[in-house]
Regions:
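Alpha-helical interface subdomain recognition
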Residues: 1-80, 114, 118, 252-412
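Structural signature of FAD isoalloxazine-binding scaffolds in flavoprotein oxidoreductases
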Residues: 66-75, 148-153, 203
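N-terminal glycine-rich flavin-associated loop
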Residues: 86-106
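FAD-binding glycine-rich core of flavoenzymes that anchor FAD
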Residues: 102-122
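A short, Trp-centered hydrophobic/proline-enriched beta-strand micro-motif
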Residues: 117-134
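A short core secondary-structure module
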Residues: 125, 165, 171-211
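Flexible, small-/acidic-enriched active-site or ligand-binding loops
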Residues: 137-146, 174-177, 204-239
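Cytochrome P450 C-terminal beta-domain/meander region
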Residues: 149-169
Length: 412
């Protein structure tokens, strides 16, 4: 393993950091989240056209840059530093990989070039608040209970025959960027008990009838959530086979999402720490900078070690996505603790609405609610590794920790 960044990765980091330093400061973030879409459309188009950000990990044959998950993780670390409100995670992490993996050639050709060019945003909608379970990050996704079915509610799909395809009925309560996405990938339950399965469907909100989208008040305004109601809504099956359950395909996508979220959290934690260090260097008390006090130094040193450890885990996961869940747990924990200490070390001003410290704290809390929490992420990995006994009657496995081509070596 060569842990050094390539020249291309360094250039992605440098270019994004310079641009976001100019265009995504705390005041810019506050302005962007209060728009109808919840992000700066002009900046998003610039990131797409000049840097190819949404298509960074998409194949060149579909208009993408042709890089991999590692390059996208480097970019996400920088967007995390700036707390950039954008549809990047929803579009490039949740939706695009599923379209690329499961879509027909016609669907990939029609959708992926538009996503790569920034002309189309997309997101994944799953019933209730079960996104982390559906992605295989927490709980047990294999049974598909999160998708509903029968009396379990969720979102139901029924074929209508002919050219009309499918109709969906149900509700998704927490859809990331669901109020503004131009395309929804909806996970729905189909079939009765003998043929019960979970399928993915394409819903185009601008043209489909029977869809109601409402932006919800969210803890973190940079992570806008929406409630999606589907009332006999027209939908197109993603892929060509309506007999194959997609649950197994969601787990690889979940590992990629975990890697990118971990990178974002590390970037946010590092930024919060840097801002706090700069503040304690200039804030004076008792005739000297508060950063010169030993108690403050020790707290900042502990935070630095925590952030660096989380960064190391995130970088490893970008190379070995199977470690994504553990990296995400460590990164979210690091961000939560660092953001809380940032508020405390800023003193009274850190508790004011005008200061940016609370933006980092809200990002930490909201991401844990949506994709965690931390203890469930770790518990899920432990269960899968068989630390509490063989999972589902299977022999213990170290696959949750293994690197590509490492013959299931455990990364310690």
């Amino acid at each position: 393993m060569d842990a050094a960044f390539t020249a291309e990765q360094d250039e992605i980091r440098r270019t994004l950091r310079e641009l976001l330093a100019k265009r995504s400061g705390p005041d810019d973030v506050r302005s962007a989240v209060r728009t109808a879409d919840g992000y700066d459309e002009t900046l998003w188009r610039q990131l797409a056209q000049d840097l190819g950000l949404p298509g960074l990990a998409l194949p060149q044959e579909y208009g993408g840059v042709g890089c991999g998950l590692a390059e996208l993780a480097v970019a996400c670390e920088e967007t995390g530093r700036a707390l950039l409100p954008s549809p990047l995670i929803a579009t490039a992490a949740l939706a695009a990989p599923l379209i690329a993996a499961l879509g027909t050639e016609a669907q990939r050709t029609a959708l992926l070039p538009r996503i790569a060019a920034g002309r189309l945003t997309a997101t994944l909608a799953v019933p209730g608040g079960s996104l982390a379970t559906a992605l295989g990050l927490t709980g047990d996704p294999t049974g598909g209970a999160w998708a509903g079915g029968g009396r379990a509610g969720g979102i139901q799909a029924r074929p209508v025959g002919g050219a009309e395809g499918w109709r969906l009925y149900g509700e998704a309560a927490q859809v990331l960027d669901g109020h503004s996405a131009g395309l929804l990938l909806v996970a729905a339950h189909a079939g009765g008990f003998p043929r019960s399965r979970t399928l993915l469907f394409l819903v185009r909100p601008d043209t489909a009838a029977g869809i109601v989208r409402a932006r919800r008040t969210s803890l973190d305004e940079t992570r806008p959530l929406a409630r999606i109601e589907l009332r006999d809504t027209e939908a197109e099956l993603l892929g060509a086979d309506d007999t194959v359950d997609v649950i197994d395909a969601l787990a690889p996508a979940g590992r990629g999402v975990a890697v990118l979220l971990a990178a974002e959290a590390v970037g946010a934690a590092a930024s919060a720490l840097e801002r706090t260090v700069e503040y304690v260097k200039t804030r004076e008390q008792f005739g000297r900078a508060i950063g010169s006090f030993q108690a403050v130094k020790h707290r900042l040193a502990d935070l630095y070690v925590r952030v660096q450890a989380a960064r190391s885990a995130a970088y490893y996961a970008a190379w070995a996505p199977a470690a994504g869940s553990l990296a995400l747990a460590q990164a979210l924990e690091s961000l939560r603790i660092t953001a809380a200490e940032a508020v405390q070390l800023h003193g009274g001003i850190g508790f004011t609405w005008e200061h940016e410290a609370h933006l980092y704290f809200k990002r930490a809390a909201a991401d844990e609610l949506l994709f965690g929490p931390v203890h469930r992420l770790r518990d899920h990995v432990a269960q899968q590794a068989g630390l509490f006994g063989p999972p589902n009657g299977q022999p213990p496995s170290s696959s949750a920790f293994a690197a590509p081509g490492s013959a299931e070596q455990v990364a310690v």
